[in-house]
Amino acid sequence: MRKLSEVKGEEALDVLAEILEPIVEIAEDEEVRAGFDTNVAKCVAIALKKYKKQILEIFASINGKSVKETSEEIDLLSLPSYIVDVLSEPAVRRLFT
C-alpha cells in the first residue's frame, strides 16, 4: 500500500478529492474521536465496524485501485499495516484530534 506522502503532483489532488469525504465522515464520529487520544486500538475497532465502506474507499483511492480490487486484496494480516500507514500520516492524525 502506498503512503499518502508518496502520492505527488496532480495525482495528489485527485486522491485528496476522493478520500476527503470518507475521512471527514469517520473523523466527525464522536465515538471515534473520543477514543483516538486514549485508545487508538479501540478507535480503529469502532471505525472498522461502523465505516467499512469508507475505509475501503480510502485504501482504494490511495492505491489507485477500485474498491472491489481493494476488498479482494485486503486480508487479516495486511489490514493492520494499512491502518497503521494511514494513521501515521500527521495530516490524518490532526483530523481526529
Across the structure, where does each feature detected by a protein language model lie?
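Charged interaction scaffolds used for protein-protein
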Residues: 1-48, 53, 60-97
